[in-house]
Amino acid sequence: EDNIENCLLSIENCVDEIIVVDSYSTDRTKEICQQHKNVRFLEHTFLNYSEQKQFATDQASNEWILSIDADERLTPSLEDEIKSLELNDENISAYYINRKTAYLGKVLKHGGIATEKILRLFNKKRGHFADVKVHEYVETNGKSKNLKGYIVHDPYKNLSHHLGKIDKYTTLWAADRYERGEHCS
């Protein structure tokens, strides 16, 4: 609920359709989404992040998918860059996008997560989400290109929220590794 408004505002003018998959939250997310054009709000039981994103991908009526989380937003320059793309090149199956992370509202300039390239725009006929529980990613067949613009990722409300996410993600990561036969001593 806290992030969805800015996320939707950043993408609604550069995509034909917005699919929001919600795992039956009880906040105002649905109400906020229904106030925006081209939004299809779908509820789906949460199993893991990859499964949730693949479900959304499967519901899309277009071949090209821009995958973005609620705590992310496109910069105006990235929005313009996406709108100008010619997406009919059969040799290109995906685009990597730069992502800058903000911490408590301030964009980081240094460190491992300050800026990273992530595959977020892809052709669903040539790509899918890998079967992992956390830190989902897209696997594609074909060539990819890099875009110049960037997404701003602002994932933490406060320190307590940050620590809660660490606990959640490490638990999911450990369960994923255990199910794959990787065990710790």
Which residue stretches match the model-derived regions?
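A conserved acidic beta->alpha catalytic loop
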Residues: 10, 22-31, 46, 69
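Conserved donor nucleotide-binding strand/loop of the catalytic core
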Residues: 16, 30-59
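Short, acidic, metal-binding catalytic loop of nucleotide-sugar glycosyltransferases
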Residues: 9-18
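Glycine-centered tight turns that cap/initiate beta-strands
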Residues: 14, 38-41, 64, 91
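Aromatic-flanked redox-active Cys/Sec active sites in thiol-based oxidoreductases
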Residues: 1, 15, 23
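Acidic helix N-cap motif at the loop->helix transition within catalytic regions
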Residues: 2-6, 27-35, 77-78
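Catalytic-site signature of metal-activated, phosphate-bearing donor transferases
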Residues: 50-57, 63-68, 75-185
